[in-house]
């Protein structure tokens, strides 16, 4: 299925690219989220008319994400308290939601989907550097300190 991208999508393309994707990916992800439209003659004309508006929106989103990244980088270590055993092993774990809530409480809005924990949830006390991806092109690192309650 050929679609026109309305946003930059990792490993697929940039705004305005006509790409061929599997029908299920287009129907279930790209089209419902407004990230693409079906590539037919009418939609190509509509897209070309809206191209400047979409590029301006994309630039504004990128600038907002860069601003949030600076605020996150400027934060001191975010402290999360959790119940832990004697050797510093947590009885539960600290996941993406806990980190996002702690950063939001510190004053910078952060969604749990933006937090990247490639090795899984944090299961011990200590200091960690957690990557947050605010935009496809903007990443930042937040310092998280997990302490025992």
UniProtKB/Swiss-Prot annotation:
UniProtKB keywords: Ribonucleoprotein, Ribosomal protein, RNA-binding, rRNA-binding
Recorded superkingdom: Bacteria
UniProt cross-references to PROSITE patterns, sorted A to Z: RIBOSOMAL_L9
Disulfide bonds: none
Cellular component terms (Gene Ontology): ribonucleoprotein complex; ribosome
Keyword RNA-binding included in the entry's annotation: yes
One example of a Gene Ontology biological process annotation: translation
Keyword rRNA-binding (UniProt): yes
GO molecular-function terms, A-Z: rRNA binding; structural constituent of ribosome
Signal peptide: none
Stored Pfam families: Ribosomal_L9_C (PF03948), Ribosomal_L9_N (PF01281)
Function: Binds to the 23S rRNA.
Family: Belongs to the bacterial ribosomal protein bL9 family.
Identification of the protein by name: Large ribosomal subunit protein bL9
Lineage: Bacteria, Pseudomonadati, Pseudomonadota, Gammaproteobacteria, Alteromonadales
Gene name of the record: rplI
